[in-house]
């Protein structure tokens, strides 16, 4: 089977609620996209709202409050919104990387694999049925002499020592207490809605299907980059994909061999090429799914304009499925910076998108300036 990149982009946009825009709930978006990155809360709100024909900026907060969504460390060690019932397989595959077992992790964190095991057991007991701020949790932990040496690292806002606990399903974010984050045990927070933590071999096909359902066609390497920044065992990855057999179809996309779900193959083949403009927020999953190193979606010479210092991913302009520029709001004006080799952008289409960004941002109007 063959497909063009513009067909692939159009199909992905349909699957990701970008074209056409309908009215999905926040949990619909989060489920389809295999999570929404959520280090910057306002950006997560925007990226969900931009996928709604009538943007509902409060949908994320509302669905977190009613426990339809959870916030936890997941893919690539970053904070994500996930559906509680679907989180287990993603977390299982992250735990499977065993990043805390590597000497480099021990050197960087000062915490040994055995101490991570002890922390996991202790935190599971402490958080069962309660919600604690970071300070409250750490204070309880360091009352045990085993954890005294970890106090500074445990109080760190980066949470590197706590991430393996999230992947093992014993810790997630609870409701904020003022400006303080809290943690709790997923099983006690979500009850029957908390899905089980399957073994990696059981989790893998679930996650692969979900990923390809939003970001296919994709290679094994692209999947691993999205999941774990290429930290998963390569033989395991090949086995997981190989075991799916006829559920996957190989597609030749202008010379790149990649996989799509067999159930989606005919739909992809019949998809018309992608056209039009979209303004997407920072850290948007349309780009994070294939990754900023995907040279078809984002030309390598422009990657530095999008993937910035300290892991920041800029809001992007997408034309015909490819990233062709960045944008920002400056003094209540939406400023678009096309890449130098980009053809002139259609002003009316950009202004229409800017109006949608304004609605999703809760402002009345955003005049456009293309620089």
From Swiss-Prot:
Entry text on domains = Adopts a unique fold in which three tandem winged helix-turn-helix motifs scaffold a positively charged concave surface perfectly shaped for duplex DNA. The active site contains a QxQ motif and a beta-hairpin essential for base excision activity.
State whether keyword Ribonucleoprotein applies.
no
Quote the EC number: 3.2.2.-
Official protein name in the record: Interstrand DNA cross-link repair glycosylase
* Gene knockout outcome: Essential, it cannot be deleted.
Biological role: DNA glycosylase involved in the repair of interstrand DNA cross-links (ICLs), which are highly toxic DNA lesions that covalently tether the opposing strands of DNA, thereby inhibiting essential cellular processes such as DNA replication and transcription. Acts by unhooking both sides of the ICLs, forming abasic (AP) sites on both strands. AlkZ specifically repairs DNA damage induced by azinomycin B (AZB), a natural product with potent antibiotic and antitumor activities that interacts covalently with duplex DNA and forms ICLs.
Q: Which InterPro entries match?
A: AlkZ-like
Q: Which UniProt keywords apply?
A: DNA damage, DNA repair, DNA-binding, Hydrolase
Give the protein family.
Answer: Belongs to the DNA glycosylase AlkZ-like family.
- Please tell me whether the keyword DNA-binding is annotated for this protein: yes
Q: What is the effect of changing residue 39 to A?
A: Abrogates d7mG excision
Q: Which domain of life is it from?
A: Bacteria
| Upregulation | The gene is adjacent to the azinomycin B biosynthetic gene cluster.
What organism is listed for this UniProt entry? Streptomyces sahachiroi
Q: Name one Pfam family in it.
A: AlkZ-like
Effect after changing residue 37 to A: Abrogates d7mG excision
């Amino acid at each position: 089977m063959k497909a063009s990149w513009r067909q692939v982009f159009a199909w992905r946009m349909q699957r990701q609620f970008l074209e056409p825009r309908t009215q999905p709930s926040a949990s619909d978006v989060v489920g389809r996209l295999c999570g929404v990155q959520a280090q910057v809360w306002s950006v997560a709100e925007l990226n969900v709202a931009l996928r709604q024909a009538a943007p509902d900026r409060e949908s994320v907060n509302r669905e977190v409050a009613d426990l339809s969504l959870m916030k936890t460390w997941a893919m690539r060690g970053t904070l994500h919104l996930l559906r509680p019932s679907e989180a287990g397989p993603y977390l299982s595959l992250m735990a499977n990387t065993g990043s805390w077992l590597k000497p480099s992790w021990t050197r960087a964190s000062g915490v040994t694999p055995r101490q991570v095991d002890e922390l996991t057991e202790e935190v599971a007991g402490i958080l069962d049925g309660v919600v604690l701020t970071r300070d409250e949790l750490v204070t309880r932990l360091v009352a045990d002499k085993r954890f005294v040496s970890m106090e500074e690292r445990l109080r760190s806002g980066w949470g590197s020592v706590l991430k393996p606990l999230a992947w093992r399903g014993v810790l997630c974010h609870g409701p904020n207490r003022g400006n303080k984050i809290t943690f709790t045990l997923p099983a006690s927070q979500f009850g029957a809605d908390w899905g089980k933590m399957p073994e990696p071999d059981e989790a893998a096909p679930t996650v692969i299907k979900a990923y390809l359902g939003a970001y296919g066609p994709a290679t094994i390497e692209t999947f691993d980059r999205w999941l774990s920044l290429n930290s998963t065992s390569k033989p395991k990855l090949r086995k997981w994909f190989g075991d799916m057999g006829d559920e996957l179809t190989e597609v030749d996309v202008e010379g790149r061999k990649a996989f799509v779900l067999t159930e989606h193959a005919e739909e992809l083949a019949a998809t018309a090429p992608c056209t039009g403009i979209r303004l997407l927020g920072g850290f948007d999953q349309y780009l994070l799914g294939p990754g900023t190193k995907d040279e078809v979606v984002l030309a390598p010479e422009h990657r530095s304009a999008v993937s910035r210092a300290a892991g920041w991913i800029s809001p992007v302009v997408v034309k015909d499925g490819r990233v062709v520029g960045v944008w920002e709001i400056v003094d209540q004006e939406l400023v678009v910076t096309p890449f130098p080799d980009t053809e002139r952008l259609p002003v009316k289409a950009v202004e229409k998108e800017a109006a949608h960004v304004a609605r999703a941002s809760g402002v009345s109007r955003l005049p456009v300036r293309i620089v």
